[in-house]
From Swiss-Prot:
PANTHER family: FLAGELLAR L-RING PROTEIN. GO terms for molecular function: cytoskeletal motor activity. This is Flagellar L-ring protein. Pfam families: FlgH. It comes from the Bacteria. The gene is flgH. HAMAP family: FlgH. Keywords: Bacterial flagellum, Cell outer membrane, Lipoprotein, Membrane, Palmitate, Signal.
Length: 237
């Protein structure tokens, strides 16, 4: 018996390709010290021309009859997280197809096609017929619910020309089993900020909220690489 030999180099290449495909199924892990979420310090105002006898400095005015709210780059705002999302969907499909056909030939060029059966019984003929039926049914349901509550204090990263505040920041918490983080970025109207410098996360436009973590607890909630292979779209069955 001839044996087919496979080069070891081909086996190595195939293994590397499989590992690469499986690594793409792994969710990226958040890392600390991301420059995008770093605290933004207040900008140093440009020195204005000296105004003899004046104590007013442009850019640092305050309303004597209003509340002090964040409105400059580097100011601090506390965001109250009150996110609740629920989604559900269902789909049902059914398809049925029936077909029946028959073919009967009794003569060809004027000659009969029916012949005597040498075994006995009925005469032989070229008549044919078939029946076909096909049925396909499908049913699918999905439901998901998420909730996130808490608070994160962020800084004003930029002030748009229309007065909208671009805020972003993060909170890292080191626990016994690893690290937990909450990141948030978005746009806030100054009118939505409460008197205590807090704003609800539901009032943030273009919000980017991330809740993730690292450590033993995060690892146990992730399936292994072998399980991810069978759950990936690349699995042929």
């Amino acid at each position: 018996m001839n044996r087919i030999s496979v080069p070891r180099f081909s086996v190595l290449i195939a293994s590397l390709c499989g590992i690469t495909l499986l690594s793409g199924c792994v969710a990226p892990t958040a890392k600390p010290n991301d420059p995008y979420y770093a605290p933004v310090l207040p900008r140093t105002p440009m020195s204005a021309a000296a105004n003899n006898g004046a104590i007013y400095q442009a850019g640092f005015e305050q309303n004597l009859y209003g509340d002090r709210k964040a409105f400059r780059i580097g100011d601090i705002i506390t965001i109250t997280l009150s996110e609740r999302m629920a989604a559900s969907k269902a789909a049902t499909s059914a398809m049925t197809k029936d077909s029946t056909n028959s073919i009967g030939l009794t003569s060809l060029f004027g000659s009969g096609l029916t012949t005597n059966n040498p075994i006995g019984g009925n005469d032989l003929s070229l008549n044919a017929g078939y029946n076909g039926a096909r049925t396909t049914k499908g049913d699918g349901k999905a439901a998901q619910s998420n909730s996130l509550t808490g608070s994160v204090t962020v800084t004003v990263a930029d002030v748009l020309p229309n007065g909208i505040l671009a805020v972003r920041g993060e909170k890292w918490m080191t626990l016994n089993t690893g690290d937990e983080l909450v990141r948030i970025a978005g746009l806030v109207r100054a009118d939505d900020i409460a008197t205590d410098n807090t704003v609800s996360s539901t009032r943030i436009a273009d919000a980017r909220i991330t809740y993730s973590g690292t450590g033993a607890f995060a690892d146990t909630s992730q399936p292994g690489w072998f399980d991810r292979f069978f759950l990936s779209p690349l699995f042929p069955f």
